[in-house]
Amino acid sequence: MKIAIPLDEKGMLPDRFGKYSSPELRRDGNNICSFPIEVSGVPEGAKSLALSFVDYDSIPVCGFAWIHWAACGVSPDTALIPENASHSGEFSFVQGSN
């Protein structure tokens, strides 16, 4: 299976998906707009997909790997989890909360 996310010319997530996002993409000072995820090559017979976005670079800052996002119940027929799926309500999946 292969996943792809949009990266800028430096190989980083674009600012709109991180701490430099614009005010309309923030809640309580934190970015809330999830990046799109392209999915391909899902194994035949898969019944469901799950994802986790774990930030291991946070260990020196807070002492543990920060889990930014966890979700399950994604259809194996999904080719694209759209931008802002975490908040738009337009994409069917179950999300974890922290």
Q: What residues fall within each predicted segment?
A:
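N-terminus-centered regions that define maturation/targeting leaders and the start
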Residues: M1-N98
